[in-house]
Amino acid sequence: MFALVLAVVILPLWTTANKSYVTPTPATRSIGHMSALLREYSDRNMSLKLEAFYPTGFDEELIKSLHWGNDRKHVFLVIVKVNPTTHEGDVGLVIFPKYLLSPYHFKAEHRAPFPAGRFGFLSHPVTPDVSFFDSSFAPYLTTQHLVAFTTFPPNPLVWHLERAETAATAERPFGVSLLPARPTVPKNTILEHKAHFATWDALARHTFFSAEAIITNSTLRIHVPLFGSVWPIRYWATGSVLLTSDSGRVEVNIGVGFMSSLISLSSGLPIELIVVPHTVKLNAVTSDTTWFQLNPPGPDPGPSYRVYLLGRGLDMNFSKHATVDICAYPEESLDYRYHLSMAHTEALRMTTKADQHDINEESYYHIAARIATSIFALSEMGRTTEYFLLDEIVDVQYQLKFLNYILMRIGAGAHPNTISGTSDLIFADPSQLHDELSLLFGQVKPANVDYFISYDEARDQLKTAYALSRGQDHVNALSLARRVIMSIYKGLLVKQNLNATERQALFFASMILLNFREGLENSSRVLDGRTTLLLMTSMCTAAHATQAALNIQEGLAYLNPSKHMFTIPNVYSPCMGSLRTDLTEEIHVMNLLSAIPTRPGLNEVLHTQLDESEIFDAAFKTMMIFTTWTAKDLHILHTHVPEVFTCQDAAARNGEYVLILPAVQGHSYVITRNKPQRGLVYSLADVDVYNPISVVYLSKDTCVSEHGVIETVALPHPDNLKECLYCGSVFLRYLTTGAIMDIIIIDSKDTERQLAAMGNSTIPPFNPDMHGDDSKAVLLFPNGTVVTLLGFERRQAIRMSGQYLGASLGGAFLAVVGFGIIGWMLCGNSRLREYNKIPLT
């Protein structure tokens, strides 16, 4: 329990002879008493010894009774932590200026004037303001700052931080600006008062709206910094953002010329980044306030802003270099795209360390600070230029949702179900924009649902749908996402790479179909997710993985954050949405290394900046991005392939699989190198014993294990059949070394014909002539049957004459037998009573 007592310290000297105790008068409520002796007093600290303890408290009358003359400059607050059984404990001391005892009311206009000039500031928008009887003062009476711990590093000499080289200068007061430059409002344009769109054209062109709401609707608020370590701040509030999970929290408050970003992590100490105009000074609450006021830690003020960084994370979580970097963020640029570009870069690099959670802590703080600063930069840019753009609002909303998920899941190690984010920005109303978007999607005529628009338009529509989604996606948005993924899948069957627009469209389509939080009981959404995972895994062939990794390496090698924006959607790959975890195996890393010379610019950069071992390490980390993104997201796995977790099976949870292939509902193929504990198990022959491949067919209802026999037959040729005989089956190509190369779902009759064409196939994985003798293939049927793919029987053209009549009848008989065999494999091959026949639907 805690007890609080206020007494007066007579300065400059306290002696035993002139001790003064304050006793409640009869007029005041009886609150008990405490006696304390001041044993030592020095220029640096005070020490108190507890001689007696009784329950105590304080009220307004008692506090007012302490209001002495002007010669008494300070009062002290005694905070006692006492064991309720032994009445023994520790005593702490906090010094408060005496003027706090007199309520002081902040004088300000109810409405702030619009700033004068392009980058004008309001007159003193951020002002230190405190009153002992103000509700915001309560945190200072309950804080542990200076009692149980100190929020700042113990040595004030280290509070002054150097200004980073990237911080703003007098010649460059607003930092860098990316290309293309921010559009300006055309002459004679009448600006809307708020962001909205009534047609899809609003996404294709620049739509401007006024920033006047940021001034007319701003409210005066009080902010109490971290642990009450700095006196309260009044500011004109223009918005807030809250990102939370079970292991991390980022709270951002934005105002006119003001930002507070409180970043906390369950495994680390919290920090707070505060930005004020360069003319504003904040005062820290320290034990030295008797003699002089200290500014909180931070660099010298810049040409526009002053930055402070609070928290013991200053000297415990970070290196000095990292601390200086974070303090520079708000002054590096007022272009929000710059900060988001840096956040994406850090997030991508963080995924290469996803198996080493203790290393992600610093990345977590950096990304969180970048996210907060991007909101501040957009708010300030809009305020000072007096306008915003609709695409800026959509862009920021999608970035908040996506980066929050990556930040919390990979940076903080949070459970995905606990991740949430809310934004309340005065210059945009996501709820209103969501309703307008729903109306637009609702105007799509059913006859046009299957019509596929350009990838540019699809990307813009899906990006907006993802950004403004509130847990429920419009049925036509889901339909568009499905069509985009299927179209890209068909294209990747005959090529190895995607252009930037296709990658962006694929990113937003997959995010919509895979990452939903509401309606988990909706079987159609789960089916969408299973189909998406299967298609993404099928697109992630060995050849595509190599090209996608080269795209990422080029994106990072050529990264110039002062010119162009870098985002993860720009380098997105189906491998990042696949369920493959094997791409860090040596053969895939070596394939990437051998392909680097095919891109001369990248090859030159890598060999100029890195030695051979560093190049190999960079290649390995690039491939690790693919294995980390979706394949290790337990939320996605639990939602869409729950059968791999039944029967207390921890293999998937521990990542003990090479890949997962969803089959019919409730069943999946799992490929592993470990000994399976359940399921129908097939061991691929002629594979290196040190790198075995086991194909396991899992059912949600079966916990037993049984060995299956791989069929070795020539399959019937499907050319003369209208129906798709092999649709739903999966083609798997592997090497005798045990490496998995390609996984392709047979999705249509055209794909089936390409599979049967063998040496004439235009789909490279299907063509055996394009691979060596060490390449093998099997076909995985949806009912759990596995067949070695040797070839397809062709029925020859037969002349209808008596000489060949017998041969014709014999051929027909063989065809019937062949189709009977394949039908048995598709629907009737159940080796265990626990594995029932599964309809091919």
Curated annotation (Swiss-Prot):
Signal peptide region: 1-17
Membrane topology: Single-pass type I membrane protein
Intravirion-side positions: 824-841
A Pfam family assignment: Herpes_glycoH_C
Cysteines paired by S-S bonds: none
Virion surface side stretches: 18-802
Post-translational modification as stated in the protein's UniProt record: N-glycosylated, O-glycosylated, and sialylated.
GO cellular component: host cell endosome membrane; host cell plasma membrane; membrane; viral envelope; virion membrane
HAMAP family per record: HSV_GH
Assembly information from the UniProt record: Interacts with glycoprotein L (gL); this interaction is necessary for the correct processing and cell surface expression of gH. The heterodimer gH/gL seems to interact with gB trimers during fusion.
Protein name per the record: Envelope glycoprotein H
Organism whose genome encodes this protein: Varicella-zoster virus (strain Oka vaccine)
Gene designation: gH
